[in-house]
Amino acid sequence: MLGASEPEDVIKQCTQVLEHIANDNSVPRNIRRSANDILATLKNEAEPLFLRTSSSISILEDISNDPNIPLHTRTLIWNVASQLETIPVDE
């Protein structure tokens, strides 16, 4: 994930990680459902980029506090949120 500077590249990398989380059966269903919701939000090009990323970050922060989430998944979620935070708001 490091080194991605273009917002499209960041979105692409984040969607790959989120797809991995959504397809991981060791992750609780509510977390997988949220990952699918975030994927749908990020892929919805009818909304501005800053709105898609801020909505996604909000959902990621909510699910990262879930006590049932596996540690490896929590780390992935934090990484995705950090990457999404690098996308500039003014575009």
Swiss-Prot record:
Family, as annotated: Belongs to the UPF0147 family.
UniProt name for this protein: UPF0147 protein Mbur_0922
InterPro entries with a match to the protein in the record: Ta0600-like_sf, UPF0147
